[in-house]
Amino acid sequence: MIFATLEHILTHISFSIISIVIPTHLMTSVYEIVGLCDLSEKGMIATFFCITGLLVTRWIYSGHVPLSDLYESLMFLSWSFSFIHIVPYFRNYKNYFSTITAPSAILTQGFATSGLLTKMHQSAILVPALQSRWLMMHVSMMLLSYAALLCGSLLSITLLVITFRRNIDIIGKTNHLLISSFSFDEIQYLNVSFRNYHRYQLTQRLDHWSYRVIGLGFTLLTIGILSGAVWANEAWGSYWNWDPKETWAFITWTVFAIYSHTRTNKSLQGANSAIVASIGFLIIWICYFGVNLLGRGLHSYGSFTLNI
C-alpha cells in the first residue's frame, strides 16, 4: 500500500513539473531569458528522477521489471524522452531536443495516466510468456530505440519544415527583387542571404543531430530485435514467426536502414534522407501502438494489455 501511494505521488509530481516546464521553455525560446532556461532544464532533471523513482517503486512492490504492459511501457518511454533531454545539458551541448522531448514526455505520460489505462495502473502478476530473463533486455532496448528514433525523426521533420519555408521565401523574395529598385535590391539581397545562411546552418545542425540520434536508435533497435529473436526461440521454438509485431519491427528496421544508406550518400543527404526519417516516424507508432489495436499475434495479450 505504501509503495502504491508513493508511486501515485511521484506520478503526479512528475506530471506537474513537466506541465510547468513546457510553457517555461516556450517563454525562453521567445524571450531568451537565461534564468528561465536553466529553470526549465532543472525541471526536466527533476521529472527524470521522479519517473525513475516511480519505475523503481513499481519494480520493488511488483517483483518484476515494470515493462509488462502498455502503462508501464509508456512510463518507460516517457522516462526515455526525459533522459534524452537531459544528456545534452550535462554534456554542455546546445539542446536541440528540448522542444521535442518535453512535449513527447508529457504526452506519453498523460496517455499512460489517462482513464483508458486505469486497469493497468495496478501491477499484476506476469503472464507465463513474460516470465523470462529476456524481458528486461528485449523490451528496454525496443523502447529506448523507439524514443531515440522518434526524437531523430522529429528533428528530420523540423528540418523539412525549415527547408520548405526557406524555399518559399527564396522564391518570394526573388520575384520581389525583380520588380524593385536597384539600391533596394541590394539591401533585400543581403537580408535574404543573411537569413538563408543562418537557416542553412540550422538545417545542417539538425541533420547532424538527427543522424546521430537515429544511428543510436537504429543500433538499439537491432539489439532489441536480436534479443527478441533469442527469446522467441526459447519461448516458442522459432527465432522468427512473422506475426504482426515482428513484421512491423522488420519494416521499421528496414526504413531506418534505408535512412542510414541515404544519409551516407552525399547526393541524398538533407531533405531526401529527412523524408525517409519522417516516414519512419509513422512506422514506429504503427509498430509500437497500432499493431496491438489492429492485429493479433504472439505479441498481443488482449486490448491495451501489452505492447512490446
From Swiss-Prot:
A GO molecular-function descriptor: heme binding
Superkingdom: Eukaryota
The keyword Thylakoid is assigned to this record: yes
Transmembrane segments: 15-37, 43-63, 70-90, 97-117, 142-162, 213-233, 246-260, 274-294
Protein name: Cytochrome c biogenesis protein CcsA
GO biological process terms, semicolon-separated: cytochrome complex assembly
GO cellular component: chloroplast thylakoid membrane; plasma membrane
Chief place of localization: plastid
Job of this protein: Required during biogenesis of c-type cytochromes (cytochrome c6 and cytochrome f) at the step of heme attachment.
Keyword Plastid: yes
Membrane-topology annotation of the record: Multi-pass membrane protein
